[in-house]
């Protein structure tokens, strides 16, 4: 039986980069667990800020955390007070000097993680799952997505038996490496159990840099 590989992991090193950018031999395990703690803390502290992804860069004794958010105002706070508080709390989780950078997500409607979280929030508010899914599909296409697939699984609508439902519009080629496919997952915690929400968004095609460099340049004129 065929299984679906993670679309982001499948494209790492081809058209997508890693979310943790550092190299270490001796302290690898320590830094890895540190990264997990830092990410969990930021997501917990800024749950309402619409966090898309968190990038962590390390160099010497410094840690740079790039928070991609749809609502940068919530993260920064009044006159930057919010960002300073979070930075101080993050400093307690690591021995290295912390730098916090906020990156605004311009189109939240075409960000898979934010779309998945939006669907999960609607399900928690008892909005009909089909309505929430269809609305997300239409909105993503309206804002320039080439294709989108949305799937929900669990006790949908409070039914006794769990099931899996999905909708797709446009192109979502999961095995085309040059296809820029974003993937997001969120869980809706409802009174009748958890419902998993998965979103795949095709944002277009990207030619890998290495392939672009190898491609021969075409010039006018006949061959010698």
Curated annotation (Swiss-Prot):
Keywords: Ribonucleoprotein, Ribosomal protein, RNA-binding, rRNA-binding. GO terms for biological process: translation. InterPro entries: KH_dom, KH_dom-like_a/b, KH_dom_type_2, KH_sf_prok-type, Ribosomal_S3_C_sf, Ribosomal_uS3_bac-typ, Ribosomal_uS3_C, Ribosomal_uS3_CS. Disulfide bonds: none annotated. One of its GO terms (cellular component) is cytosolic small ribosomal subunit. Pfam families: KH_2 (PF07650), Ribosomal_S3_C (PF00189). Signal peptide: none annotated. Gene3D superfamilies: 3.30.300.20, Ribosomal protein S3, C-terminal domain. GO terms for molecular function: mRNA binding; rRNA binding; structural constituent of ribosome. The keyword Aminoacyl-tRNA synthetase does not apply. Residues 38-106 form the KH type-2 domain. The keyword DNA damage does not apply. Binds the lower part of the 30S subunit head. Binds mRNA in the 70S ribosome, positioning it for translation. Part of the 30S ribosomal subunit. Forms a tight complex with proteins S10 and S14. Belongs to the universal ribosomal protein uS3 family. This is Small ribosomal subunit protein uS3. It comes from Anaeromyxobacter sp. (strain K).
């Amino acid at each position: 039986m065929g299984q679906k590989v993670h679309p982001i992991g499948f494209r790492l090193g081809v058209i997508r980069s890693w979310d943790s950018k550092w190299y270490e031999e001796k302290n690898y395990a320590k830094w890895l667990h540190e990264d997990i703690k830092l990410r969990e803390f930021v997501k917990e502290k800024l749950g309402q800020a619409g966090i898309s992804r968190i990038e962590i860069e390390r160099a010497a004794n410094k840690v740079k955390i790039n928070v991609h958010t749809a609502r940068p105002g919530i993260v920064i706070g009044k006159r930057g007070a919010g960002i300073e508080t979070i930075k101080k709390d993050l400093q307690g989780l690591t021995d290295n000097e912390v730098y916090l950078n906020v990156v605004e997500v311009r189109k939240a409607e075409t960000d898979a993680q934010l779309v998945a979280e939006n669907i999960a929030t609607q399900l928690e508010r008892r909005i009909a799952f089909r309505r929430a899914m269809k609305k997300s599909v239409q909105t993503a296409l309206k804002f320039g997505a080439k294709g989108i697939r949305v799937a929900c699984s669990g006790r949908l609508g409070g039914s006794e038996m769990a099931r899996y439902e999905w909708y797709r519009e446009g192109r979502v080629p999961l095995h085309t490496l040059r296809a820029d496919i974003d993937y997001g997952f969120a869980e809706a915690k409802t009174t009748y159990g958890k419902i998993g929400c998965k979103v795949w968004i095709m944002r277009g095609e990207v030619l890998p840099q290495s392939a672009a460099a190898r491609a021969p340049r075409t010039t006018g004129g006949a061959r010698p």
